């Protein structure tokens, strides 16, 4: 990952993510590289370029969260429904000092449904109230 001056702060990891996912990641700041748009173009994720300024909202208010089983180390996925379903991949920097947005792309509704059914994604409610 680049030096810190090439990064933009986009949010914070919340303890609520740990609670829903049953993990224990350290609650660190989340950054994105200034080069993320170029990465998205290179990976042909054009559809999500219009959502790049929504990253703080996706982090603060995801509809679904999960763990990518294909990634080693600390890596989570956040999905937010807009006109398109937008997935953010967030990883722990190798130095372990911060989290960063590793990828961003759209996912089809059928894929979201399959991942919910398999347990890879879990519904996330920010203001969930406990019922008595």
Question: Model segments located where?
Answer:
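Ribonuclease/tRNase effector modules and their secretory precursors
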Residues: 1-132
